[in-house]
């Protein structure tokens, strides 16, 4: 397979409108010349998306200590953070864009990587052994509910009401065959091969680094993101989840934040 073809290295620019053009073309871009505070991250969303914004909640810190995120078992600054989508704690109403603003980088490690989900579907469709998976991803509903969060039973590949294709990438705990599946073994095989192929691609694509005052803007419906292990425990980023008028199913109910703190199911 042509796994070296599925990576995206965002172009850099200091022009927010150029960022919007690049994101629409490539799925991602890097905006330079920024401040390094959480409000600077939110301002990026306002400058790039303008009146297309529906919501730009407070930024969440991304560092070794974390904040309100549920961390996958075994993940630390010493391990790779595998490719994933952000915000699926909100179910199918996950944010359509994400922003990651660098406050402090690690000199050693911490490189980011992006896998183009649209391109991955094309590459897998051409493979004799994996060609069955892309159609299955678009037709087989699975359980995509993060533990304790908003429920989601849907396909990994969806087309939104406005025609936008949306993909979701999660770990083996949060994406699993549905209890009512007619063929759970085949559904599990679909999920494993999808996940393993994306993880394998990470070793074949170029990586890049964010430096202080730079932010990447990523189409969260199209690209999956991750980062390598790093040495400096003081590495610090600000993450902003963004909902625009082009999001698939509108805003989640209630207060929003750029992490899962407000997505938990309310006790009955």
Annotate the PLM regions.
Residues 1-66:
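N-terminal non-catalytic cap/leader segment that marks the start of a structured domain
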Residues 2-13, 24, 61-268:
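Active-site environment of non-heme Fe oxygenases that use a 2-His-1-carboxylate facial triad
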């Amino acid at each position: 397979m042509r796994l070296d073809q599925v990576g995206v290295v965002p172009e850099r620019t200091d022009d927010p409108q150029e960022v919007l053009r690049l994101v629409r073309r490539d799925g991602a871009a890097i905006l330079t010349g920024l401040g390094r505070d959480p409000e600077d991250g939110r301002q990026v969303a306002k400058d790039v998306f303008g009146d297309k914004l529906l919501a730009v909640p407070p930024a969440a810190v991304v560092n070794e200590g974390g904040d309100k995120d549920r961390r996958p078992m075994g993940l630390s600054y010493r391990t790779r953070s595998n490719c994933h989508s952000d915000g699926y704690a909100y179910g199918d109403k996950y944010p359509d864009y994400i922003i990651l603003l660098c406050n402090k980088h690690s000199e050693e490690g911490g490189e980011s990587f992006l896998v183009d989900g649209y391109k991955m579907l094309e590459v897998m469709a051409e493979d004799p052994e994996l060609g069955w998976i892309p159609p299955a991803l678009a037709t087989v509903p699975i359980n995509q509910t993060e533990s304790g969060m908003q429920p989601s039973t849907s396909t990994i590949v969806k087309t939104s009401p406005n025609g936008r294709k949306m993909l979701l990438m999660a770990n083996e705990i949060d994406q699993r065959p549905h209890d009512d599946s007619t063929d759970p073994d085949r559904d599990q095989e679909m999920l494993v091969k999808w996940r393993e192929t994306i993880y394998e691609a990470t070793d074949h694509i170029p990586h890049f680094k964010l430096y202080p005052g730079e932010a990447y803007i990523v189409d969260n419906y199209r690209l999956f993101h991750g980062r390598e292990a790093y040495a400096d425990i003081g590495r610090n980023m600000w993450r902003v989840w963004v909902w625009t008028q082009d999001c698939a199913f509108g805003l989640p109910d209630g207060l929003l934040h750029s992490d899962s703190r407000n997505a938990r199911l309310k006790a009955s």
